[in-house]
């Protein structure tokens, strides 16, 4: 009698965020199926959970058109090799984690060979290049979506999709410890505190830092005790911000932080930030915010024509209304930014109402995503 093959799950993660998701998924699957086998493209966290890495995740982690073009031959070789090897292995399910440009084509190749496929983390098809939804529908048996409006979008096009909640919402408490965060950062409990988050990319920091600093100067006039915290993602962004600050606001006292974005948000009465995942994290930290964003005029002109949503920030997309003030392009200037932040720093009705809505939205997307994803994989594997 031949021994039954263990449940075999193939996975491909292309960057750190995908490695974190993959590790959480593997952990949840191992609790249910201890002898399951995991193979594919994995980062250090997935490998620590027992995933066999046929390729290192860094091979796929390229950004920018020039970088991608330089590595295109290698990327195409890896994809062709994975198509062949997964085709021979015939895993019970293939899970492509984010990295849509690489994974969706791979998923399509595998689906044609009769392998069940899942795409974990929806690309922003609901916002732009909506026709990608048809390619995703052809390539995958199931999309796992973090946010409820993403599922609503796929339902409209009859693409199987499961809303699993957001892992970040699982990781962050419903009621953050503001005083604890202030202890960590050395901020007095009774001071007003503003977080400035000018983005994680060089272009964002270049475009936004001067206006954000000038806004903080204006707010200091109303709140002389204002503590300003500026978390920066790495040494490169910190140097860039320090250079801009030396030109624009050399005398403005601020706390520069290496990372610690989450602590800064929890500790602050209000935040001024670039859009993106930071806005979702800020909402989960229950920190009232204003989104300020600026890009090159042609890029903005193009984005306005391509983007199909009324809002750019995730809190507003989740709420379905302008919960958070968004000041874009010409609107993103110090006087307007300061005027939008003043009522939030006052800690009155406006910020309390925003805090309550943030808590409700947090509960909506706090669904134990790792467990939900594992359940979806096992159901498809049957």
Curated annotation (Swiss-Prot):
GO MF, any single term: phospholipid binding
Gene Ontology biological-process entries: lipid A biosynthetic process
EC number: 2.4.1.182
Alphabetical list of CDD domains matching this protein: Glycosyltransferase_GTB-type
Pfam families: LpxB
Keyword set includes DNA damage: no
Chemical reaction(s) catalysed: 2-N,3-O-bis[(3R)-3-hydroxytetradecanoyl]-alpha-D-glucosaminyl 1-phosphate + UDP-2-N,3-O-bis[(3R)-3-hydroxytetradecanoyl]-alpha-D-glucosamine = lipid A disaccharide (E. coli) + UDP + H(+); a lipid X + a UDP-2-N,3-O-bis[(3R)-3-hydroxyacyl]-alpha-D-glucosamine = a lipid A disaccharide + UDP + H(+)
Domain of life according to the entry: Bacteria
Pathway: Glycolipid biosynthesis; lipid IV(A) biosynthesis; lipid IV(A) from (3R)-3-hydroxytetradecanoyl-[acyl-carrier-protein] and UDP-N-acetyl-alpha-D-glucosamine: step 5/6
Record bears the keyword Lipid biosynthesis: yes
Keywords: Glycosyltransferase, Lipid A biosynthesis, Lipid biosynthesis, Lipid metabolism, Transferase
Gene Ontology CC: membrane
Reported function: Condensation of UDP-2,3-diacylglucosamine and 2,3-diacylglucosamine-1-phosphate to form lipid A disaccharide, a precursor of lipid A, a phosphorylated glycolipid that anchors the lipopolysaccharide to the outer membrane of the cell.
PANTHER family recorded: LIPID-A-DISACCHARIDE SYNTHASE, LIPID-A-DISACCHARIDE SYNTHASE, MITOCHONDRIAL-RELATED
Similarity comment: Belongs to the LpxB family.
Name of the protein in its database record: Lipid-A-disaccharide synthase
